[in-house]
Amino acid sequence: MRMKKFFNEWKWVILAGFLLLVFAFCIRFYNLTLLPVFADEAIYIRWSQVMNAEPTLRFLPLSDGKQPLFMWILMFFINKVSNPLFAGRIISVFSGIGTLIGIFAVSYLLFKNKLVSLLSVLIWAICPLSFFFDRMALVDSMMTMFGVWTLFFGILTTKTKRLDMALIAGFCFGCGMLTKSPAIFFLLLLPVTWILVKKPKDLIKVIPLFVVVTVVGYGMYNILRLGPNFNMIASRNQDYVLPISRIWTYPTDPLIPHFIDVFVKWFPKMGPWPIFALILFGLSASWKKYWREKVIIVISWLGPLVILAEFGRAFTVRYILFTFPVLFILMASGILVKNKIIKSLFYLFLFLFIGTSLVFDYHLLTNPAKANLPRSERSGYLEEWTAGDGIKEVAEYLKSEELKNPNKKIVVGTEGFFGTLPDGLQIYLNRNPKIIVIGVGLNLNEVPESLLESKIAGNKTYLVINKSRLKVDSDKLGLELIASYNKSPRKDINSSEYINNGPQEVLLFFELK
């Protein structure tokens, strides 16, 4: 009887939830490798390949102060998939689906309303802010997933006062810390859930359980001490964080500029703009009934956002991705509004949000250059040296040359030493040991000596470099242009890149003659 009652109450929710899940997966999976490899993606995927090949280097990311969980997962199947970029990005696709399920769980746990939960899922599924990064081989999507589930089991721990819930919350927090350092916010925000405790004496039972969460999470994190360079995590964290002392001299810098980035540059475009109205509806709807739940949501969203905006040296959309799940739950809770006129306005802005989001997503799926990305995102992922346009094509050409010349070694010099090049080329040539890829530096005025020596030794020798990094006429260096690959045109004519390097970056592929 209980199962029949449960099915009757939940059958439409299960069906709708399943359809939303399938829809979210399909739109994330479609054309997954359309966007060229990004600098950090190339690094993470290359690390995974090296870690797979050499067991003694399983802690390789620590050399750059990065936690390795994403790479540990990727290394197990990186060689089983023909396209390494697809292998890396599919992890984020599944992480996004894990976040989606977690959003449903958290929203229902807080509001006990099926419509709020389904709407929260829909918003995550289509919002460009989440959709874009769920299709990138970056660690942020995975960290966001662990953050949602840490919050879910943290709330359950507070409500049930059960040790097993605290242990699971600790495991989720620990996985987050093994993914990326900002996961520390997941632990710092858990005491906010204590607002759900209705009897002060119950805190005596709850607080020790959160000590358990901390011990389990940091116990997992300390696994990293088994590898060399554990100290590099703290060292590299300092590169991204401003000292606390500066708040006394510059309290609004960079807080105000970063808030302008979020609310003036990012949200109107990638939100997209109806997000502002939905946030206001969510804040006002049924406040008296759900004020505790909404305090948890608002602090979980704004707390990390304010701290990152105040103390972050680097500040981009993906650095605040983990704050979006609770924000989307808040937006969905606007459906709880009672006033009919206000509810009609909520539905109007909801439909506008759905329409504008789907148009944005369509461009990302078919022609990312047409998507109305903020300048910082467009520049990094589409326009500048960090965008890997042409790299896969260069790799395919080199593979064909290897087949034509099986007895000859092929040496390829690329600009840089770390990042889009040479890592972006190495990930595609991992199974071609006769093709040697080496970084030769930046801003070249002459052919590097290592490439000249390779040519003298009888090897087929090539150079891959972005146009802005080649500071001399290629004809004077004896370079024969094989192919060139245009990146997306620079839209901001006032940017330093446009002024110094022209309207478009180009990847150049040369052979030494």
Predicted regions and their residues:
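Membrane-proximal, lumen/periplasm-facing interface regions of secretory-pathway glyco-
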Residues: 351-400, 416-424, 500-504
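Short acidic/glycine- and proline-prone juxtamembrane loop motifs at membrane-interface regions
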Residues: 38-39, 92, 129-143, 316
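Short helix- or helix-capping micro-motifs
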Residues: 21-24, 120-125, 173, 177, ...
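Transmembrane-helix motifs of polytopic, lipid-linked glycan transferases
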Residues: 86, 90-111, 149, 153, ...
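Membrane-interface transmembrane helices that cradle and orient dolichyl/undecaprenyl
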Residues: 3, 108-114, 150-166, 176, ...
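Aromatic/acidic, Gly/Pro-rich catalytic loop(s) in extracytoplasmic/lumenal soluble domains
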Residues: 433-513
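Transmembrane-lumen/periplasm boundary regions of multi-pass, lipid-linked membrane glycan transferases
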Residues: 44, 49-50, 175, 186-293, ...
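Specific aromatic-rich, kink-prone transmembrane helix
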Residues: 102, 123, 142-159, 165-173, ...
